[in-house]
Amino acid sequence: MKTILAVETSCDETAVAIVNSDKQVLAHEILSQAEHKKRGGVIPEIASRAHMEHLSGLIKSAVEKSNLNFCDLNAIAATSGPGLIGGLIVGTMMAKAIAHVAQKPFIAVNHLEAHALVIRLLHEVKFPFLVLLISGGHCQFLIAQDVGKYIKLGETLDDSLGEAFDKVAKMLGLSYPGGPLIEKLAKKGNGTRFKLPRAMIKRSGCNFSFSGIKTAVKNLVQELKMSEQDVCDVCASFQECISDILLDRVSNAIIMAESLNIKINDFVITGGVAANNFLREKLKQHINLNIFFPPNDLCTDNAIMVGWTGIERLQKNYIDPLNFAPRPKWELESY
């Protein structure tokens, strides 16, 4: 059995986990930075300072709760990209320091791969499988062929889906993060009232574009007095629009996989936006594949997914040198 201590500091969550190859989570400590909610978005400098302030305490707490010592660990893993460079440096340097002192292997984890693979901690999802990664910083389709081996089928040409949710929420006067509030208000709204543009729909390929939807919402806000019901109807119409786009793109992704002679049975939808229950249900109803969603706490950023990905990479003997530099931009294809 292998056991890993993992660190996640790529954005505004400071998290530490201890995970083993028997699929047991021995400890998980996470601190979300409330400061960014007051400011309407993540401030990179504030985020990195908070990581420096809290990370060592979370590591100490996780080790104590696991009833292990550093000598009991088989490796130390950290999210080393992509993400905000300040946070990546804090987490990666701390993990490398522990690895050096404890004389344990260091594993640099790609944040995107961690989102893609965490489902295998919970379910018997076998390679190859289709991945839709929808989060605050990323929106892309991938075929996961194996650990460290991916084919990107498409991605956003402008904003990520999470950014679109947050920016639309801000236009409507809602607080950050906007996704949960849009989902809540949409339940009271009429999703057919406003016809928002479905960019890229009915076109070949798997790319996305969400800038036109934002512009359409901005125009609605300027035209209407935006009563409480108007806000609810915009939220509902926005979610309907997004679900139509995702369904269209998924169909194309399946076709692209077939054209590559890759048989896909399992479809994993992950990332922060995958916690949206409306989108989950729409995709479940219309996609004829085995669909898997991580639980909500594993859709958003966490260290459990980093630890499990560390386990998967350790089992392949994918070890990284202690001079590995964090990468704010890191394509999963080149992993």
UniProtKB/Swiss-Prot annotation:
Enzymatic reactions: L-threonylcarbamoyladenylate + adenosine(37) in tRNA = N(6)-L-threonylcarbamoyladenosine(37) in tRNA + AMP + H(+)
Cofactor: Fe(2+)
Keyword tRNA processing: yes
Keyword terms of this UniProt record: Acyltransferase, Cytoplasm, Iron, Metal-binding, Transferase, tRNA processing
Cofactor: binding details: Binds 1 Fe(2+) ion per subunit.
InterPro entries recorded: ATPase_NBD (IPR043129), Gcp-like_dom (IPR000905), KAE1/TsaD (IPR017861), TsaD (IPR022450)
Location in or out of the cell: Cytoplasm
One CC-aspect GO term: cytoplasm
Chain sites annotated for binding substrate: 133-137, 166, 179, 276
Taxonomy, superkingdom: Bacteria
Any single biological process term in GO: tRNA threonylcarbamoyladenosine modification
Broad EC category: transferase
GO MF annotation list: iron ion binding; N(6)-L-threonylcarbamoyladenine synthase activity
EC numbers for this chain: 2.3.1.234
Family annotation (SUPFAM superfamilies): Actin-like ATPase domain
Binding site for Fe cation: 111, 115, 301
Similarity comment: family membership: Belongs to the KAE1 / TsaD family.
Protein purpose: Required for the formation of a threonylcarbamoyl group on adenosine at position 37 (t(6)A37) in tRNAs that read codons beginning with adenine. Is involved in the transfer of the threonylcarbamoyl moiety of threonylcarbamoyl-AMP (TC-AMP) to the N6 group of A37, together with TsaE and TsaB. TsaD likely plays a direct catalytic role in this reaction.
UniProt-recorded name of the protein: tRNA N6-adenosine threonylcarbamoyltransferase
Lineage: Bacteria, Pseudomonadati, Pseudomonadota, Alphaproteobacteria, Rickettsiales
